A protein has these predicted regions:
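Acidic, small-residue rich beta-repeat scaffolds with periodic aromatic anchors
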Residues: 5, 11-16, 20-64, 139-211
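Short, non-transmembrane alpha-helical segments in secretory-pathway proteins
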Residues: 61-90
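N-terminal post-signal-peptidase region of extra-cytosolic proteins
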Residues: 92-99, 109-111
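Acidic, divalent-cation-chelating loop motifs in proteins
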Residues: 96-104, 126
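Acidic/hydrophobic-patterned starts of short beta strands in beta-sheet-rich repeat architectures
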Residues: 103-113, 180-186
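Primarily extracytoplasmic ectodomains and periplasmic/lumenal surface modules that are beta-strand-rich
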Residues: 104-107, 116-120, 129-130
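Structural motif
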Residues: 117-123, 193-196
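Extracellular C-terminal loop/segment signatures of secreted glycoproteins
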Residues: 123-139
Length: 211
């Protein structure tokens, strides 16, 4: 079943601000005066929703691992001391995507940025590169998964959805699918659930569905 939500940029910002006001996280990733230039690993122990306590290991890549990022965006991410978390399935650098997210033909980017044990999904629209939009913010350990029993890593992945790949909403959010003329962001908890973020008339339409 696909669930539809429409969220304004203001509402998202308020939600993330509230989340960031929580007590500081105890995480292996520590603050540094300099921007990390090499791959880092965040490790620790956490209790899963089923009550089992496991060890996790999350690979974090520096922004320099993504040379195709425009300099203006890379500079902002480095200023925030961002590292890009990689899923436990990753074989090549991931979780940085490029497409027409604002409108047809626009040149936009989305990036997962991990800082001090928490990750934010930032979107850089061409019309406001200097003011990235934060679509989701959560602890790095919120979504974990593994290919091998006991070897847990991040299960948060983002990818580009072309207009034809955007799922239908039973609520009729997109009665005329010919109006879907630009890309969307697939924001997934791998093998569990996913959300599709589509920007329309200044609002992010969010379609959520289990995998």
């Amino acid at each position: 079943m696909i669930i539809l939500r429409a969220v304004t940029v203001t509402a998202i910002a308020a939600l993330i601000a509230a989340t960031m006001a929580e007590p500081p996280l105890i995480a292996a990733q520590s603050e540094s005066a300099s921007v990390p230039s090499t791959e880092q690993t965040e490790t620790g122990r956490v209790r899963l929703p089923n009550g089992i306590e496991v060890t996790y290991r999350i690979r974090l890549l520096p922004i320099a691992s993504f040379p195709s990022l425009p300099a203006a965006i890379a500079a902002q991410l480095n200023e925030k001391k961002c590292m890009v978390p990689q899923t436990y399935q990753a074989r090549t650098p991931e979780n940085v995507i490029h497409g027409a997210l604002e409108r047809k033909g626009s040149d936009d980017w989305a990036v997962l940025c991990s800082v001090n044990g928490a990750t934010t999904l930032y979107v850089f629209l061409q019309s406001q590169i200097a003011a990235p939009i934060a679509l989701r913010h959560q602890r790095d350990t919120e979504w974990l998964g593994s290919e091998v029993l006991g070897a847990y890593g991040s299960a948060w992945g983002i990818s580009l959805r072309l207009p034809a790949q955007i799922p239908a909403a039973k609520s009729g959010a997109f009665p005329d699918r010919s109006n879907l003329d630009h890309d969307a962001i697939e924001d997934a908890d791998i093998e569990r659930s996913s959300a599709t973020h589509y920007f329309q008339n200044g609002t992010w339409i969010i379609l959520e569905s289990p995998n």
